[in-house]
Design a protein with these regions (language model features):
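Donor nucleotide-activated moiety binding/catalytic core segment of transferases
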Residues: 49, 54, 202-220, 225, ...
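C-terminal alpha-helical cap of glycosyltransferases
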Residues: 361-384
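Compositionally biased low-complexity segments enriched in polar/charged residues
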Residues: 218-257, 382-384
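Catalytic binding pocket for nucleotide-activated donors in carbohydrate/polymer assembly enzymes
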Residues: 283-284, 290-361
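A nucleotide-sugar donor-handling region in carbohydrate enzymes
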Residues: 86-150, 178
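Histidine-anchored nucleotide/phosphate-binding helix
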Residues: 1-9, 148-164
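Active-site and donor-binding regions of nucleotide-sugar-utilizing enzymes
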Residues: 1-107, 179-184
Length: 384
């Protein structure tokens, strides 16, 4: 939408959508024509066009369908909603590196035969909520069809907290999606594994929800209980002096060791796009993401970040092409794409990725061609 407004300033560009709020959250304030179901009021994002209707029957010269949900795209289905649609004025666009709906007119994504990513100047709002160093995790849950979501999160945090450059942080925070909060609270094996990893480096572990702050672990409290237990036992065997010596030694060891805390922040997300980009910018160099928008937003604002990527089954092709373009071997498999303990040094040519996969260059050329074809056909009565 933003590209078309910039490229063709004289054109009237409008959005037709079944999810108006998503565009509002992206900061788009222009009028949006609602797409509604002919019978139902519930979610209908992935419904065939023949079951849908427009809230406004305004006619347009040119239609771009993004993303395509049927394979292949059926112009006759679209005509049920837009009767004057033709093969000359209707074009299709895929999601990034989508292989399920090809062929399309605008195959966006990374690599050969794709038109690039939607790069643009970032608009962000600097975050002022978190004062300590922090990491950002923004991935989908297992409930969304991703079987290795928990594994992905654990791989990332274990890698990050073990890095020497982050070990000096006395308090470290991790911004997490709310499904991780729910899994920690409701699925004990996951909670147990989280605690096992964090206890290696931190004396305190806190989980912040939208309603409360929960202390999951505190080594000071445990040591106090142990010392008290030793004192009770020593009285029973009349060896109180020995007990005091042991407790003093334990206390000295704890005092000499830096007390470190990790806070899992489940109270931050979701945010508007501008605020979310602000959180990305202020975070440590390593970041864990999934999906399209967050990936491109991070490349736009902060190309110096090391992006660890949660590979969804339907994004495998994107990950493979990210590997081809950047040389980052971690993108080859989900086992290393979220975090890799075996080695931190690897090729990651982000400059090449951005330079050779810019939709503003590749996409503009194809849009110009499409509009020329439309114009020629519209003004040539002999065209079929």
């Amino acid at each position: 939408f933003t590209y078309l407004k910039k490229w063709y300033p004289g054109a009237n560009v409008q959005i037709l959508s079944a999810s108006k709020e998503k565009f509002r959250n992206l900061g788009i304030k222009e009028p949006i024509i609602d797409i509604k179901h002919k019978k139902y009021k519930d979610d209908h994002e992935c419904t065939k066009f023949k079951y849908l209707k427009l809230s406004n029957n305004k006619k347009f010269d040119f239609y771009l369908i993004i993303p395509v949900i049927s394979d292949p795209f059926e112009i006759n289905d679209f005509k049920k909603m837009v009767p004057h649609a033709t093969e000359w004025n209707t074009y299709t666009m895929s999601e990034y590196n989508d292989t399920d709906t090809s062929p399309v007119d605008f195959p966006i994504g990374v690599g050969k035969n794709h038109l690039g990513l939607f790069f643009d100047k970032s608009i962000l709002e600097k975050q002022n909520i978190i004062k300590n160093p922090y990491a950002v995790v923004y991935i989908q849950s297992s409930g969304d069809g991703l079987l290795h979501s928990r594994y992905c999160f654990l791989s990332f945090v274990e890698m990050v907290i073990s890095k020497t450059k982050y070990k000096s942080f006395k308090t470290f925070e991790v911004v997490i999606p709310y499904w991780i909060v729910e899994d920690i609270n409701e699925y004990y094996p996951f909670k147990k594994k989280c605690l096992e990893i964090f206890k290696k480096y931190y004396n305190e572990i806190h989980l912040v929800t939208k309603d409360e702050s929960i202390e999951l672990y505190n080594s000071k409290r445990i040591n106090c209980k142990r010392i008290d237990s030793k004192r009770i036992n020593s009285k029973r065997i009349n060896s109180n002096k020995t007990s005091k010596k042991q407790s003093n030694k334990t206390s000295k060891k704890q005092n000499n060791k830096t007390h470190k805390k990790i806070i899992l922040r489940g109270d931050i997300l979701p945010q508007s796009r501008e605020k979310f980009i602000g959180f990305i910018q202020g975070s440590i160099k390593d970041i864990l993401l999934t999906g399209d928008e967050s990936l491109v937003d991070t490349l736009n604002c902060c190309k110096g970040k090391t992006i660890w990527y949660h590979i969804a089954p339907w994004k495998k092709n994107l990950a493979e092409n990210l590997y081809s373009e950047t040389g980052n071997k971690n993108y080859k498999t989900y086992k290393t794409s979220c975090g890799n303990m075996k080695g931190y040094k690897f090729k990651n040519d982000i400059d090449k990725l951005i330079k050779e996969n810019d939709f503003r260059i590749k996409g503009k050329a194809r849009f110009d061609s499409a509009l020329i074809c439309f114009h020629e056909n519209n003004n040539n009565k002999e065209s079929v």
